[in-house]
Design a protein with these regions (language model features):
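Aromatic/hydrophobic pocket-lining residues that form π-stacking "cages" and hydrophobic walls in ligand
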Residues: 41, 148, 216
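Glycine-rich, flexible loop/turn motifs
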Residues: 1, 50-51, 56, 72, ...
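Flexible, acidic/His-enriched mid-domain "rim/lid" segments that flank
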Residues: 8-9, 13-47, 109-137, 153, ...
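Extended, compositionally biased flexible segments
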Residues: 15-105
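Short, structured patches in soluble enzyme cores that scaffold and shape functional sites
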Residues: 93-95, 112, 125, 148, ...
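Acidic/histidine-enriched ion/cofactor-binding microenvironments in catalytic or ligand-binding pockets
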Residues: 68-100, 176-215, 219
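A contiguous pocket-lining binding segment that forms or flanks enzyme active sites
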Residues: 133, 140-195, 201
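Single conserved hydrophobic/aromatic residue that forms the stacking wall/gate
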Residues: 1-7, 12, 217-220, 224-227
Length: 227
């Protein structure tokens, strides 16, 4: 988003979004359906006086996108889809209050997961950390994308290019696009007050698409503020 948001409004929307996300993560257990996780997310958002941002967005039928294993993103919750031991589940949540949207996601391993999958989750989290660290006033979007791409590829992983991060504010998806690849010093310059979602989407090359997605919001100041 290319304009500044009011600080208190951002704090409220991001707190509600985070509460709903972690409620969904806690509900993610073997034998639980993806629809039940969605129900928990929906109830958490509405109980805080907010509206689920995803419900009805582009026709989406639920409050949370829940993607399991090889599903990339935007998975639709299903009353028949049971979570199993060893699954990895990405839960993506959006909440709107006071006219402002929040957007956050987390990928959780259910019970014991394969060592290579655990490493993928850890590397993706570090990709996010490095992307946040690059979100400094005066840097450019290419600095963020390069930080994510360089770390992922150092492990031989692939970066998904079909989907990118984005600005977020009055609308769920705003300019600028925030790719997970790029070259330092290129792209839109980061300015104080910008609010963006950094969304690393990383996969195991040649072994199916396991794509943990971690989102954050930040404001580009002298140092980034992780909301």
């Amino acid at each position: 988003m290319l304009r500044s948001l009011v600080g208190s409004e951002m704090c409220i929307r991001d707190r509600i979004t985070a509460e709903a996300l972690w409620a969904g993560v806690r509900a993610c257990k073997p034998g639980t359906t993806t629809w039940e996780i969605n129900r928990v997310v929906h109830e958490t958002i509405t109980s805080r006086g907010a509206t689920p941002s995803f419900l009805g967005l582009y026709g989406f039928p639920a409050a949370a996108c829940i993607s399991v294993n090889e599903e990339l993103i935007h998975g639709i919750p299903d009353k028949k889809h049971l979570i199993k031991e060893g699954d990895i589940v990405s839960i993506d949540v959006g909440a709107c209050i006071g006219g402002y949207h929040g957007d956050s996601a987390y990928t959780v391993g259910v019970g014991e997961i394969a060592p290579e999958t655990k490493q993928l989750l850890e590397v993706t989290q570090e990709c996010l950390n490095r992307g946040i660290a690059a979100a400094l006033k005066g840097n450019r979007l290419g600095d963020i994308g390069s930080a994510v791409q360089t770390y992922a590829e150092s492990y031989g992983y692939g970066v998904v290019r079909e989907y990118v991060g984005h600005g977020v504010g009055r609308k769920m998806h705003e300019d600028p696009e925030v790719p997970n690849y790029g070259h330092p010093g290129r792209g839109v310059r980061l300015m104080p007050g910008m609010t963006i979602a950094i969304e690393p989407m990383i996969n195991l090359k040649g072994e199916g698409v396991y794509t943990p997605v971690s989102y954050t919001h930040l404001r580009a100041h002298e140092t980034p503020e992780h909301l």
